[in-house]
């Protein structure tokens, strides 16, 4: 029996798809990329209108390319659109965000009854769904979900409605899970969650968790998928200062560079607070890569607000940014606000920020030409290998030896945007090494 999983959206979904894959394997399925499988799972996203469109398109693709499959739709889109999806009788099983581990139970039930199953828990107060992995298929960087849900209710965001309230994985389970992954050869682990920095288990907060994780023997890199600026407290700064296991990259959502818009968004900081904390981070790690998310065209965003955001992004010197045009989401306060921004104006502002993004990326990448950086190599094509540095630069090298899954020291020779091109220091000719090590 074969199964295929289509995954959309965030790193949390990537982790949860791996858990589903494990469950399928344990029950006799070969998880494959080949279509026309016996079981087909679509793990959906609904964070933006575009995510909704991609989810619908992927569901239709999955149905068409897997005509004999038991089709299962799970995740954030099915959590809020389960009634709409239930009208499509080609979808056999519909699960939400809090019961993805019920796939096997539901497959067996469907085989018996041949009746569509809709199992979506609409209560916001959930318990943390038990999930644990000891490998990550076809990857050399493993994601570990430590937390689910969000209590912030930013006025633009549907996620508190799809993921429910904050709940967290047991402290000991997180440590055991990462220890198992490291024993199985993973050198880098990425902590992920819906609101990762809100982690709390008994008396252990997020910084306590980091303190224990960095002690795990054999773990070379610990990456945080995303963290709010308000959670970067003195305890976190102390860990950043003391541990070289924490990578030189941190993703801190900004959302807007206008204090007026931040207030309308119900964000918990202003630009001054944000800037001051960034300065503290750079005092500890001068070359750290700081990336962010911004939303363009939030209701009420006028030209001055956009210019303020543009200037603030330029001033902070992000090494990269994700740019999203604002889209109305059901249940959110922003969807009901006056002064919705014209779509053409949004598109023009997005274009301007994408140009700024490219300039910022090039500026940051160029700082490392001639420098030696450690790279975890993840993919290969013949003698060409691609991986990422601690500060999340994408690097390409050529090598005759197999370096996939290994961390190698590389000298960066040039930029072929958006990739850095370098050479393994171990393969540099002797006469050149003296220059490199000066």
Please provide the spans of the model-predicted regions.
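Proteins enriched for Cys/Gly/acidic motifs involved in redox and nucleic-acid/cofactor modification
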Residues: 1-192, 197, 202, 235, ...
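Residue-level signal for inorganic ion chemistry
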Residues: 41, 76, 103, 191, ...
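Short glycine-enriched, charge-decorated loop/helix-capping segments at active-site entrances
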Residues: 46-47, 163-164, 263-269, 336-341
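Conserved SAM/AdoMet-binding glycine-rich loop
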Residues: 71-72, 80-81, 85, 183-303, ...
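Short flexible coil/turn linkers enriched for glycine and charged/polar residues
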Residues: 137-140, 150-152, 246, 256, ...
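Short, conserved catalytic or interaction motifs in soluble domains
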Residues: 148, 159-164, 229, 267, ...
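Conserved loop-to-beta-strand segment in the C-terminal subdomain of adenylate-forming
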Residues: 248, 329-335, 422
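Terminal RNA-binding accessory module
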Residues: 336-438
């Amino acid at each position: 029996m074969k199964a295929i999983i289509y995954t959309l959206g965030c790193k949390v979904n990537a982790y949860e798809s791996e858990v589903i894959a494990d469950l399928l394997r344990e029950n006799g399925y070969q998880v494959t990329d080949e279509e026309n499988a016996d079981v087909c799972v679509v793990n959906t996203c609904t964070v933006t209108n575009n995510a909704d469109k991609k989810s619908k398109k992927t569901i239709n693709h999955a149905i068409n390319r897997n005509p004999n499959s038991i089709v299962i739709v799970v995740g954030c889109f099915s959590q809020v659109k389960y009634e709409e999806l239930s009208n499509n009788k080609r979808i056999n099983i519909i699960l939400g965000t809090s019961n993805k581990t019920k796939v096997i139970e539901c497959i067996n039930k469907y085989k018996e009854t041949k009746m569509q199953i809709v199992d979506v828990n609409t209560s916001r107060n959930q318990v943390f769904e038990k999930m644990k992995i000891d490998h990550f298929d076809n990857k050399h960087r493993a994601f570990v979900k430590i937390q689910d849900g969000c209590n912030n209710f930013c006025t633009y965001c549907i996620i508190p409605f799809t993921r429910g309230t904050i709940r967290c994985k047991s402290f000991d389970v997180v440590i055991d899970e990462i220890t198992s992954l490291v024993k199985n050869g993973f050198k880098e682990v990425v902590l992920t969650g819906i609101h990762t920095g809100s982690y709390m288990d008994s008396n252990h907060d997020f910084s306590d968790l980091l303190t224990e994780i960095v002690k795990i023997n054999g773990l070379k890199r610990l990456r945080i998928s995303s963290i709010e600026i308000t959670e970067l407290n003195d305890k976190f700064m102390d860990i950043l200062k003391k541990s070289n296991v924490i990578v030189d990259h941190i993703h801190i959502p900004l959302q807007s560079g206008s204090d007026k818009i931040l207030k309308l968004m119900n964000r918990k900081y202003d630009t001054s607070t944000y800037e001051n904390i960034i300065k503290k981070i750079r005092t500890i790690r001068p070359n750290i890569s700081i990336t962010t998310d911004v939303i363009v065209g939030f209701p009420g965003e006028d030209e001055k607000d956009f210019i303020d955001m543009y200037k603030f992004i330029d001033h902070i010197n992000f090494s990269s940014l994700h740019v999203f045009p604002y889209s109305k989401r059901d249940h959110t306060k922003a969807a009901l606000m006056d002064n919705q921004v014209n779509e053409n104006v949004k598109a023009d502002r997005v274009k301007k920020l994408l140009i700024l993004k490219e300039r910022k990326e090039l500026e940051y990448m160029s700082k490392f030409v001639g420098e030696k950086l450690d790279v975890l190599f993840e993919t290969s094509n013949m003698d060409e290998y691609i991986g990422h540095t601690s500060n999340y630069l994408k690097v390409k090298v050529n090598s005759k030896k197999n370096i996939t899954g290994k961390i190698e020291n590389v000298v960066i020779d040039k930029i072929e945007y958006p990739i850095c091109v370098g050479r393994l220091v171990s393969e540099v000719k002797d006469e050149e090494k003296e220059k490199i090590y000066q």
